[in-house]
Amino acid sequence: MHTKGPTPQQHDGSALRIGIVHARWNETIIEPLLAGTKAKLLACGVKESNIVVQSVPGSWELPIAVQRLYSASQLQTPSSGPSLSAGDLLGSSTTDLTALPTTTASSTGPFDALIAIGVLIKGETMHFEYIADSVSHGLMRVQLDTGVPVIFGVLTVLTDDQAKARAGVIEGSHNHGEDWGLAAVEMGVRRRDWAAGKTE
């Protein structure tokens, strides 16, 4: 049973665009964390098309990847006209131009929140401490520099079992990815409110 953390709040994520960057180190732990995160985003109304997932080799690369992913999203502009995939050109031709798919603002605009997911397990050297400290500070810097919430989904644990418990793969344990999904929706909604001058 999960007894720590804030009481979950209900927020409508249907208008949000969320970016996720995850490390591939400790993949057996990463996979359930990512699944839990995405499941909670979808449960909060975030559209599948508005969830963008990228991976990097390890947690060390998370800050630069999160930063550049957000920068790339700022360069995207919504299309005002028809947008066709290569398959659409032949497979689903139509003379009714109003029936053609279009790219919506929510599926191409800047992200409302970003989630960084990684797993650091302490070994015999100081490598763990250096990486954990640098990644923590790096991700904090990204969110303060961009003004976009970056959810800290990096486990810093002492043993494999601690990691498994926090990924919800041990019976009776809680998947922390669900918490990260909820936090991303809440902070994404708040960011939009702040941008609109809302303080209540």
Swiss-Prot record:
This is 6,7-dimethyl-8-ribityllumazine synthase. One of its GO terms (biological process) is riboflavin biosynthetic process. GO terms for cellular component: mitochondrial intermembrane space; riboflavin synthase complex. It comes from Pyricularia oryzae (strain 70-15 / ATCC MYA-4617 / FGSC 8958) (Rice blast fungus). NCBIfam families: lumazine-synth (TIGR00114). Keywords: Riboflavin biosynthesis, Transferase. InterPro entries: LS, LS/RS, LS/RS_sf. One of its GO terms (molecular function) is 6,7-dimethyl-8-ribityllumazine synthase activity. 5-amino-6-(D-ribitylamino)uracil binds at residues 25, 59-61, 119-121, 152. Catalyzes the formation of 6,7-dimethyl-8-ribityllumazine by condensation of 5-amino-6-(D-ribitylamino)uracil with 3,4-dihydroxy-2-butanone 4-phosphate. This is the penultimate step in the biosynthesis of riboflavin. Its EC number is 2.5.1.78. Pathway: Cofactor biosynthesis; riboflavin biosynthesis; riboflavin from 2-hydroxy-3-oxobutyl phosphate and 5-amino-6-(D-ribitylamino)uracil: step 1/2. It comes from the Eukaryota. Homopentamer. The active site is at 127 (proton donor). PANTHER family: 6,7-DIMETHYL-8-RIBITYLLUMAZINE SYNTHASE, 6,7-DIMETHYL-8-RIBITYLLUMAZINE SYNTHASE DMRL SYNTHASE LUMAZINE SYNTHASE. (2S)-2-hydroxy-3-oxobutyl phosphate binds at residues 124-125, 166. It catalyses: (2S)-2-hydroxy-3-oxobutyl phosphate + 5-amino-6-(D-ribitylamino)uracil = 6,7-dimethyl-8-(1-D-ribityl)lumazine + phosphate + 2 H2O + H(+). Belongs to the DMRL synthase family.
